[in-house]
């Protein structure tokens, strides 16, 4: 039906007769002439109808936005004065000789000239995806997956599929369950990741595996989360953590070079402890130049409990954040930041406004200055490298609250004051995470997952001091987003059972949930390691949007619903009966 795509026509096509298929993006009726912008997935081209082709001109008068049409005509160069430099096809136009209206369009529920609500865009997603910016994002996504496949194939990785209907295993979120009709009362689980299957593939001898795979997690959603999402899943045997990082870094550098024309360079490597200490986050945005500075040792003897308490507590921390040029902040802005950090558990926000250092105490403005002597203030200013015109904010509490609150404040202030360089790309690796973290109920939970190997510890050493264990794990972070994470896996049955025990999984439960894994570990398991990238998040970064729904063809809302198909929906009672399932309404509290 077509010979060319609208958006691919160039000066090289001048004089050629072409047939185009697509949609009316815009129509301009000048009486004796009608111009339309005709659109397909590759872009837009101007088509015009003149009186010499009366039948085509008459039919063109009926055209409206989003009519699906076919046009045959001749490509010709535009006059110099009519060239549109904002269009890829702006140097040419098509003189139509014939027009076919394939399908008409009703009055549109979306308005291309105004900002539509996200609800409307999701309900009429098939119309939303016609917009050039949305089409371009999905084309970029397709390019990314193609580049990934070629890179992985070139590096000896095998694309192997793993099951979608599997067994529920504890991986940190709730599973989506699928009832079995054949096995009454039993359920499959949709995989949160192919984690155990890819490890089993390593045990099967396939030493380089990858898969671009759907994963499912029934968790509370955020703007950058979806109940179903896509991973670039990777696993290797006989490779160390640095070797895995080297290959995966090369993949991501390849993507940025091919999609953005940007060489990311070598990725710096930072430990979890350093990232938390300097940036208050395990996924620091290095485009922001501000860092947290520890000042607890300077404040242990002050008669100000807000500072002295955490400064003398082994679990406490006092950190300063120097904001270049921050002395210009108004009292209202400072109060807003004070309320902001309370979201993260902080009790307030102390500060020192540095007006003129040379004047000592008279050169600063601070509500806490009366509790600190000149010597301590000078020491704080020296350590933070404060200059005239700067602001210093303080966080004082337990280590987690200080890291969370001051880390979030660092990001917000950096954005508000334009200190974060939005034109840069800042990738890094974060390594050496704690193996376990407090579950809030007196026990421990795996910081990554229970199949991650500890670093340089035997099973006996791990059992004796699990709180000191460092995971042989690594995350890739770009511009403050965790785009991928992985680890060296446990390949020893004794170590795996030790980890299960630390997590409170008794031997009976181990056999019930992971018996197949424990059995497989008995038969010459190779050392193995892997990583998974979030394809949706990578695409989000590479297309310049901050909404993950913009890079998924048919996404769910933050309530995990599809407004277009109205999923989820109630099941047919007969289907439920066949599955031996009865829906019980929850009793309402009076």
UniProtKB/Swiss-Prot annotation:
Residues that coordinate or bind ATP: 217-219, 226, 482, 534-537
Sequence positions that bind L-aspartate: 171, 217, 448, 489
UniProt KW keywords: Aminoacyl-tRNA synthetase, ATP-binding, Cytoplasm, Ligase, Nucleotide-binding, Protein biosynthesis
Entry EC number(s): 6.1.1.12
Enzyme class name: ligase
Subcellular location, principal: cytoplasm
A GO molecular function held by the record: ATP binding
GO-annotated biological processes: aspartyl-tRNA aminoacylation
Compartment annotation: Cytoplasm
GO cellular component, one term: cytoplasm
Aspartate: region residues: 195-198
CDD domains: AspRS_core (cd00777), EcAspRS_like_N (cd04317)
Catalytic reaction list: tRNA(Asp) + L-aspartate + ATP = L-aspartyl-tRNA(Asp) + AMP + diphosphate
Annotated function: Catalyzes the attachment of L-aspartate to tRNA(Asp) in a two-step reaction: L-aspartate is first activated by ATP to form Asp-AMP and then transferred to the acceptor end of tRNA(Asp).
Stated family: Belongs to the class-II aminoacyl-tRNA synthetase family. Type 1 subfamily.
Protein name: Aspartate--tRNA ligase
């Amino acid at each position: 039906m077509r010979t060319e795509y609208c958006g691919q026509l160039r000066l090289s096509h001048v004089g050629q007769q072409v047939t185009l298929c697509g949609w009316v993006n815009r129509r301009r009726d000048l009486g004796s002439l009608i111009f339309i912008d005709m659109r397909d997935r590759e872009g837009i081209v101007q088509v015009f109808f003149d009186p010499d082709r009366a039948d085509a001109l008459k039919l063109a008068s009926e055209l409206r936005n989003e009519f699906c049409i076919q046009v045959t005509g001749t490509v010709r160069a535009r006059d110099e004065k009519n060239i549109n430099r904002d269009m890829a096809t702006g140097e040419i136009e098509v003189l139509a000789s014939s027009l076919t209206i394939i399908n008409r369009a009703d009055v549109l529920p979306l308005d291309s000239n105004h900002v539509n609500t996200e609800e409307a865009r999701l309900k009429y997603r098939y119309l939303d995806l016609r917009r050039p910016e949305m089409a371009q994002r999905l084309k970029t996504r397709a390019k990314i997956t193609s580049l990934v496949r070629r890179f992985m194939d070139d590096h000896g990785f095998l694309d192997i599929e793993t099951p979608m209907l599997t067994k529920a295993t504890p991986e940190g979120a709730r599973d989506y369950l699928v009832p079995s009709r054949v096995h009454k009362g039993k359920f499959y689980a949709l995989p949160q990741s192919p984690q155990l299957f890819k490890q089993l593939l390593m045990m099967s001898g396939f030493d380089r595996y990858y898969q671009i795979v759907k994963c499912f997690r029934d968790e509370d959603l955020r703007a950058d989360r979806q109940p179903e999402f896509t991973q670039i899943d990777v696993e290797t045997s006989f490779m160390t953590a640095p070797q895995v990082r080297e290959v995966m870094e090369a993949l991501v550098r390849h993507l940025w070079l091919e999609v953005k024309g940007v060489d990311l360079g070598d990725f710096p490597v930072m430990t979890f402890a350093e990232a938390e200490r300097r940036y208050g986050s395990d996924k620091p945005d290095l485009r922001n130049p501000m860092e947290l500075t520890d000042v607890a040792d300077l404040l242990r003897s002050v008669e100000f409990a807000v500072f002295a308490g955490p400064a003398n507590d082994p679990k406490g921390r006092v950190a300063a954040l120097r904001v270049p040029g921050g002395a210009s902040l108004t009292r209202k802005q400072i109060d807003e930041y004070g309320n902001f950090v309370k979201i993260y558990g902080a009790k307030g926000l102390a500060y020192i406004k540095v007006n003129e250092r040379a004047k000592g105490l008279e050169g600063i403005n601070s509500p806490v200055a009366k509790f600190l002597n000149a010597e301590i203030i000078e020491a704080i200013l020296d350590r933070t490298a404060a200059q005239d015109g700067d602001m210093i904010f303080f966080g004082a509490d337990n280590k987690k609250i200080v890291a969370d609150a001051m880390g979030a404040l660092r990001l917000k202030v950096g954005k508000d004051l334009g200190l974060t360089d939005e034109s840069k790309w800042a990738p890094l690796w974060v390594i050496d995470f704690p193996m376990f973290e407090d579950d809030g109920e007196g026990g421990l939970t795996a910081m990554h997952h229970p199949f991650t190997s500890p670093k340089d510890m035997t099973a006996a050493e791990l059992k004796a001091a699990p709180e000191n264990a460092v995971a042989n794990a690594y995350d890739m972070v770009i511009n403050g987003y965790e785009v991928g994470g992985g680890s060296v896996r446990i390949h020893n049955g004794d170590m795996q059972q030790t980890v299960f025990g630390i997590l409170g999984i008794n031997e009976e439960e181990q056999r019930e949930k992971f018996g197949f894994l424990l059995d497989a570990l008995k038969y010459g398991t190779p050392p193995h390691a892997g990583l998974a990238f979030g394809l949706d998040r990578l695409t989000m970064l590479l297309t310049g949007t901050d909404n993950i729904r913009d890079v998924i063809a048919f996404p769910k809302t933050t309530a995990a619903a599809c407004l277009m198909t109205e999923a989820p929906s109630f099941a047919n009672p007969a289907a439920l009966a066949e599955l031996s399932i009865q829906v019980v309404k929850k009793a309402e509290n009076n």
